């Protein structure tokens, strides 16, 4: 009560002295409190950890960043009993010195990030995000999914993401005008990729029986075979269709021992080509007694205009099949077309170059990745291969570059600032680098 009276007395004295009433101190105190809270909110929204500034995702801009990184659950905790939403998830934008911005984005499995002329495209289980020089937009998904497969830039400027689980693939497309469309493809899976405006998957009827009737009908119509093989392999289109089942574009008998799990194809017109491994149980490997069967590199080629498939052996310089040893593989590669060659590096770090016209192939190099750092993430340009790796002991992150031919790995930058987000916390498990993308046109490693 006395405080209230004192405030009234002070206000009355001010009125007498200046000829007009002053604002009570109580109002001034509230105004000061508002200012303090505003400053605190701003400080909270921009938290500094070394060379990284933590912001809300809506505050992110591409600024001078050259590398976009997706952090989330991965190899380090593959055997742990955690659900995907028990993990943190982050998007990081780094400049050429390893400094930049980081924002919390809910974790997804196999989170992918794409960077093209529209900006940095990434997502959570419920939203997709596009970060540009001007800021970040969010686009709500019609179907919530926790497992991403790959992101693609379409010729008309739209951005698409394939995600899904055991129920099948869903393609979510963010159009240039901001519209979002979604297409469900029940009980689909397997390799995915892009050819022009089409997002495609390669399925087999043994694993994905829901599509069997349509696939067998397509095979019968094209082959006239009244007794089709027991199992068929087909190329289906995942986007831009209205039916309950994806359209069947090509179909052929399944080949035992033909394996390739990919997220991209070489595309030329209506023809897609995918490096694959063909294992022959009857043929002995030339790599010693530890090998149970011969594994050779082949090109799996599908002509979508005729619906036919062909298998092209990849030959070495001596004209022999290019054989792989027990530790080499081609799955989940990152690839680029350089002249007539398709150059790619697998998720295990094996790099190859294959001439798509002649089938001539070369093994370029293999990366000996320490178990504590496995797997590394890769990106490719016409000049060479980039890898972003987190050291197992202290989670120090290094961006390195190696030319396709005639060179060794060279470090571009090393940063300790990501360790804060990658290390195990009190309530959260260890995180990994799920993927990364380079700013279009930036090739700092080659300079």
What are the functions of these language-model segments?
Residues 1-26:
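Terminal targeting segments of Actinobacterial cell-envelope proteins
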Residues 3-6, 14, 39, 46, ...:
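Compositionally biased regions
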Residues 28-48:
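Hydrophobic membrane-insertion alpha-helices, especially the h-region
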Residues 43-53, 78-108, 124-148, 164-189, ...:
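Surface-exposed loop/turn elements that mediate protein-protein interactions on large endomembrane-trafficking
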Residues 47-57, 62-65:
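Short domain-boundary/entry signatures in modular proteins, especially
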Residues 53-59, 105-118, 144-156, 185-202, ...:
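Repeated scaffold domains used in trafficking and secretory/extracellular systems
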Residues 59-84, 112-130, 150-165, 169-172, ...:
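Short beta-strand elements that form the blades of beta-propeller/WD-repeat-like
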